[in-house]
Amino acid sequence: MRLDGQIPDLGRVGVWSWSLVDQPAPQVRRAVAAFEAMGYRAAWFPESRGREAFTTSALILSATERLAAVTGIANIWARDPDAAASGANALGEAWPGRFVLGLGVSHAPSVARRGGDYARPLAKMRDYLGRIEGATFMGPPADPPVPVILAALGPQMLRLAASRTGGAHPYFVPVEHTRIAREALGSGPWLAPEQAVVVASDPGRARELARKHMSGYLRLDNYRRNLLRLGWNEAELEDGGSDAVVDAIVAWGDADTVAERIRQHLAAGADHVGIQVLSDEPFPLNDLEALADRLL
């Protein structure tokens, strides 16, 4: 399987949603059809303990006509490289130009739960990419080839993304990281950070939702190390993050204010931003429509 497939035109923004993997299939079908009707061209989703990544992709693609499914990310510990190449080719052949395979090394606790050893994640990813590239697929090939991107935060994974794949998908990052990532990648590779947002102007309510979202991530070494690299200190990362950390990671305010943060990522070098709306609703369609009106 090739690793240099061209990224389709996904527009400047897409929808990033955990609910695509943890809500019932009928609700997912209705939601992605609504995303497409609003003008979004990409639906992003993770892979952890919810619906499996390739199954989720097929669900999204079968319920829409133009929307792309982008794994953000497919966990490389969840399947061997041959299985990943087979699944990607099958999706790319069935829905040409509408699937992007984002791959990631996950996190030590999740890897341990699967019985793996997280000791050398960069080497693991490098080996995985080589084995995907060498995989033999006996079915009809995807045309165009399925593009591959990497979840990348630190300089070494960003360099690997630039040298071996189509680009990078940083998650849980401020705008400052997008500038750093673009410099590390160079001008060619695709850069698509995720941006969590709360469309609410009350600081207390907005930060409450933000901290609920952030608290688990701030216990994971990968995200903590990245924020420490960016200049925060350990104390600022405790208890769901200081106000300054919260405000850097989660954009909040009215739709105009939130849209401005997305534009800052684009100005900093992003080609595309996956917008994750934090809400009590699984699919906050009104907020997504308000942002679509301002960004699409």
Regions inferred by a protein language model and the residue ranges of each:
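Active-site-adjacent structural elements that line small-molecule/cofactor binding pockets in enzymes
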Residues: 1-296
